[in-house]
């Protein structure tokens, strides 16, 4: 989003394949990073590695561009501490900025394109998480996730004159550094109906709406390659500002038959109204977004190792 970049999905790969649901449901085999309370259903040590790839297409009436990229999705280790307590530690990308745009202009009507305007953004924010899930009694679950967010995002605007024989690139740099903690709480309720049939209810809420950040602005002159700096001048020394964050609340309901099937529905609401731009100043108020997800899973024979569809 504005400032810290495009957000990565909060759901792990196993939940993405089910439309992102996971607020109320967990099979106890894969680690649930959507609702920390449901970690208490994991009674085995689990280590997960996820990767993410994407293909983007940018197109207008004159030209078309495709961008392909990828990144690690998550590294997570889940450890049962006791029969009622499970902890998890992991690292995953939180957001990223990655774009490069150029435009060309002639200095006169008869000349060739000799001015190059460049707009570039690079950087990312990483999330290091430590979560705990507790089972209270037989039917209630509570969880808390603590995250440390850190990273840098650099946005540059440049002008390069190709007609003077020097080819110097004049660049205005805006470097933002992020470092702070965030928290998320979760709860779940699991009620037995009959014959291994359960109804599950869950909820999560972000407890942090802002984080600390610093910004440095400087003016630089680069050579033709754009790699070597000839001269630089700090326009404004590093100063602190507060980056407002979107706050998400999730609710989930699911019906589950152990080791057989599960159907569920999740609702999430994200408040973007206080999110500001990368300069720490308010922009036009953004709306509140909502999302509904309905999906499920079916296992023909949970104990089969020779044929998945048995």
Write out the residue ranges for each language-model feature.
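Outer-membrane beta-barrel porins/channels
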Residues: 1-17, 80-310
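N-terminal, post-signal peptide beta-strand-biased segments of exported outer-membrane/organellar beta-barrel
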Residues: 1-95
């Amino acid at each position: 989003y504005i400032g810290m970049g495009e957000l990565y999905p909060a759901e792990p790969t196993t939940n993405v394949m089910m439309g992102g649901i996971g607020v109320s449901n967990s099979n106890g085999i894969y680690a649930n990073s959507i609702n920390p309370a449901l970690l208490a259903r994991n009674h085995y040590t689990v280590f997960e590695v996820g990767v993410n790839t994407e293909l983007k297409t940018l197109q207008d009436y004159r030209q078309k561009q495709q961008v392909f990229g990828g990144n690690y999705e998550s590294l997570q280790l889940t450890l049962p501490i006791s029969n009622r307590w499970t902890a998890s530690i992991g690292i995953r990308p939180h957001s990223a900025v990655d774009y490069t745009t150029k435009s060309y202009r002639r200095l006169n009507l008869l000349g060739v394109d000799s001015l190059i305007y460049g707009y570039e953004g690079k950087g990312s924010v990483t999330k290091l998480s430590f979560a705990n899930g507790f089972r209270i009694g037989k039917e209630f679950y509570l969880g808390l996730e603590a995250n440390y967010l850190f990273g840098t995002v650099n946005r540059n605007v440049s002008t390069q004159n190709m007609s003077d024989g020097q080819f110097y690139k004049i660049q205005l740099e805006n470097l933002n550094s992020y470092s702070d903690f965030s928290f998320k709480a979760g709860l779940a309720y699991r009620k037995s109906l009959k014959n291994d049939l359960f109804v599950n209810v869950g909820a999560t809420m972000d407890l942090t709406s802002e984080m600390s950040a610093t910004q440095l602005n400087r003016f630089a002159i680069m050579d033709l390659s754009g790699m070597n700096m000839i001269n630089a001048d700090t326009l404004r020394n590093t100063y602190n500002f507060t980056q407002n964050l979107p706050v998400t609340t999730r609710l989930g309901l699911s019906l589950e038959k152990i080791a057989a099937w599960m159907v569920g529905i999740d609702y999430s609401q994200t408040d973007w109204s206080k999110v500001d731009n990368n300069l720490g100043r308010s922009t036009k108020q953004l709306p509140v977004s909502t999302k509904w997800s309905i999906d499920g899973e079916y296992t023909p024979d949970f104990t089969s190792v020779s044929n998945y569809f048995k």
